[in-house]
Design a protein with these regions (language model features):
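Intrinsic disorder/low-complexity detector
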Residues: 15-27, 70-127, 168-197
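Short, positively charged and aromatic/hydrophobic N-terminal segments
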Residues: 2-14
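Mixed-charge, glycine-accented linear interaction segment located at domain edges/termini
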Residues: 135-174
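Beta-strand elements of well-folded, non-transmembrane domains
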Residues: 29-35, 50-53, 125-131, 148-150
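Short amphipathic, charge-patterned alpha-helical segments
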Residues: 58-65, 155-158
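Short, low-complexity cationic-aromatic patches
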Residues: 18-25, 50-56, 112-122, 137, ...
Length: 197
């Protein structure tokens, strides 16, 4: 079923929590760590950080390495930092919160392993705008990210978030490998309070 919307751009501006100059950066780290059986093995993690620059994201990456002792068994680790195209990332109480700050940021994370299905999902949404002058439909797509317990739960969370304020179709939901999300304190508080509402 396709829904019609007269003004997607104003809706997205009101529902996108992106501050000017801030972006989500994906930090991929590879290091030698302890496996569950006690042996040393190559470990890989991915985190998302909401930062003002690549340099700030790099500082967070090094703070994560030091804080989680990822350099405990070897000084040889790899860091890859990529600016993402994520524009909207929702908060959910599925995320646990670290007591302390990491490089001045609030660290939220998933307590369950990805095998359970709990994690971050990118949900592709199609919006249909109706040109009032000629009556033609124009389709645009956006991927909205949300913590969820499954593909179906992610889709439902996006439907609830968008509500009746705009017409849309949820197309697809894909699991994202990010294990944690780091936000400035004010952004975290805003997201947590809007989730509670």
């Amino acid at each position: 079923m396709t829904y019609l919307c007269a003004d997607k751009s104003s809706f997205i501006q009101n529902h996108t929590n992106m501050d000017k100059g801030f972006n989500y950066y994906r930090i991929k780290t590879t290091w030698k760590g302890e496996a569950t059986d006690g042996s040393l093995s190559k470990r890989k993690t991915e985190e998302l950080v909401y930062a003002s620059s690549y340099t700030e994201a790099e500082k967070v990456a090094h703070a994560l390495i030091a804080g989680q002792q990822r350099d405990r068994f070897s000084d040889n680790f790899d860091i890859e930092i990529v600016k993402t195209k994520i524009t909207t990332l929702l908060y959910s109480n599925i995320l646990a919160k670290d007591e302390g700050l990491v490089a001045g940021l609030v660290c939220t994370y998933f307590t369950e392993s990805e095998e359970t299905g709990v994690g971050l999902y990118g949900v592709k949404v199609m919006f249909t705008a109706l040109n009032e002058k000629n009556g033609e439909e124009k389709h645009t797509h956006e991927v909205i990210y949300t913590p969820a317990t499954s593909n179906a739960d992610a889709s439902e969370r996006i439907k609830k978030h968008l509500g009746d304020s705009i017409d849309f179709v949820v197309r697809d939901a894909k699991f994202d490998k990010a294990e944690s999300i780091l936000w400035p304190e004010d952004v975290y508080k805003q997201k947590a309070s809007s989730d509670a509402a």
